[in-house]
């Protein structure tokens, strides 16, 4: 599930949209004007971004204003995008554009009739600038509703170069090599991996990368849609692979018990903090921001990554997430809203944020030179190279009761599995029982 703003403190504020949300803030309005197509109009936008992300997206909105003459008003909803936007739609005060972070939310909004299909121009831009898989994740029943503007690459293993050098190993190319490197790191005096078991979503990401590589994209899609059961042999195999790592002594900082008491920021600290306990931490590209901003690491020098390696004979996985721009039917400025989404589909818009940093785009036409450092370029290139084999975070596609609720569903069951990984088949059975209930609901 979504985790970007989990690193931020929560403040209850009154949103301009008329609801209360964690992480929200006062709306920011940009000035338009001039003799331009949308002069005198205002486009209201709602999304989860706050802090540096909101500031950088504002630069994109400013570029839109300069191009069209429209004013823009952005309101941060915190992590409660679906709740805040949904309540305002039902209350007759919808924003013009919303940025939704989950496929399931986009599908929910579309099926309720809240979204306007994107224009022919937006469709053409997506066909030209994006791999087909991104159009698929933005579509419901054959109509395109969502434009994926910002992506997250969740198949990156971050490491301390000093730790790997001390162990005498180089970044691995296969999962088998990664385990061998992990044992060498452990033998050199550090634990191999920091695992944020307190945050169940990190465990779903571990599973998804192993499963996508082992079982392949077709099976991944079937499991994401619950077209096959979680008791399928492919699931048991992936759990067995993951369980072997969890269970091997010395590979996890603090052991299984310690991992269950470690949250995501804590796992990054265990590798990149002042007193390192581990050499590697698996999670998405957002690890870099924590390592840099909280622990003063220089990305590409004393904090690096390697792609999550291929498992068995499979292909190296690319699991992603992203934020899709949608146009609300009940918004007051349909023309301006559609123009904004059409702008977001361009490499010009993506380039604005790419230059600001903290951003990866699935837009294949974005010049990689726009990114400010080689590490981000590598991450972006990997996402583009994956093409249609990239897959969206599976738990973000599932009903929240199964894939996105703390203390229940997949999060809780994989925490139980981390605690005791001795019976993958039993865990698969419990996952299937929880999934069946959630998907029926």
Indicate where each model-derived feature is located:
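Extracytoplasmic/periplasmic substrate-recognition and gating elements
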Residues: 62, 293-359
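Extracytoplasmic/periplasmic solute-binding protein
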Residues: 145-149, 179-237
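Short helix-initiation/N-cap motifs at beta->coil->alpha
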Residues: 76-84, 103-104, 175-179, 256-270, ...
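Conserved N-terminal structural module of periplasmic/extracytoplasmic solute-binding proteins
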Residues: 2-19, 23-107, 124, 352, ...
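Hinge/lid segment of periplasmic solute-binding proteins
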Residues: 103-155, 179
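C-terminal capping/gating helix-and-loop segments adjacent to ligand/active sites or protein-protein/ligand interfaces
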Residues: 359-365, 380-435
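Extracytoplasmic ligand-binding clamshell segments of periplasmic binding protein
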Residues: 217-294
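Short, solvent-exposed loop/beta-turn-alpha elements that line the ligand-binding surface or hinge
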Residues: 36, 119-130, 197, 214-238, ...
């Amino acid at each position: 599930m979504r985790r970007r703003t989990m690193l931020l403190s929560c403040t209850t504020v009154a949103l301009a949209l008329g609801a209360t949300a964690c992480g929200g803030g006062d709306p920011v309005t940009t000035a338009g004007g001039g003799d331009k197509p949308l002069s005198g109009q205002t486009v209201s936008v709602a999304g989860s971004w706050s802090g540096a992300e909101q500031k950088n997206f504002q630069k994109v909105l400013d570029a839109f204003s300069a191009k069209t003459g429209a004013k823009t008003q952005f309101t941060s909803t915190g992590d409660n995008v679906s709740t805040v936007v949904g309540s305002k739609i039902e209350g007759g005060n919808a924003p013009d554009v919303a940025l939704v972070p989950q496929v399931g939310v986009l599908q929910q909004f579309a099926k309720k009739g809240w979204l306007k299909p994107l224009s022919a121009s937006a469709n053409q831009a997506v066909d030209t600038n994006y791999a087909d898989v991104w159009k698929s994740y933005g579509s419901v029943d054959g109509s395109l509703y969502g434009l994926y503007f910002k992506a997250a690459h969740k198949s990156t293993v971050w490491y301390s170069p000093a730790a790997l050098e001390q162990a005498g190993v180089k970044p691995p190319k296969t999962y088998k090599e990664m385990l061998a490197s992990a044992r060498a790191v452990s033998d050199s005096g550090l634990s191999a991996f920091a695992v944020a078991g307190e945050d169940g979503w990190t465990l779903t990401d571990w599973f998804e990368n192993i499963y996508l590589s082992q079982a392949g994209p077709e099976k991944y899609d079937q499991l994401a849609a619950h077209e096959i059961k979680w008791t399928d042999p492919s699931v048991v195999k992936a759990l067995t692979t993951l369980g072997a790592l969890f269970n091997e002594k010395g590979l996890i900082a603090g052991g299984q018990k310690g991992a269950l008491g470690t949250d995501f920021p804590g796992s990054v600290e265990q590798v990149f903090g002042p007193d390192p306990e581990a050499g590697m931490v698996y999670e998405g590209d957002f690890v870099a921001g924590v390592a840099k901003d909280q622990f003063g690491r220089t990305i590409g020098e004393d904090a690096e990554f390697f792609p999550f390696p291929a498992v068995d004979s499979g292909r190296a996985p690319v699991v992603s997430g992203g934020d899709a721009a949608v146009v609300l039917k009940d918004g007051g400025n349909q023309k301006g809203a559609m123009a904004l989404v059409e702008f977001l589909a361009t490499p010009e818009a993506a380039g604005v944020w790419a230059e600001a940093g903290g951003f990866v785009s699935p837009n294949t036409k974005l010049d990689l030179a726009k990114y400010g450092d080689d590490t981000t370029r590598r991450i972006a290139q990997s996402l583009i190279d994956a093409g249609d084999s990239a897959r969206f975070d599976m738990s973000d596609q599932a009903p929240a009761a199964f894939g996105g609720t703390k203390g229940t569903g997949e999060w809780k069951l994989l925490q139980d599995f981390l605690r005791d990984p001795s019976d993958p088949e039993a865990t698969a059975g419990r996952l299937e029982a929880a999934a069946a209930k959630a998907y029926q609901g």
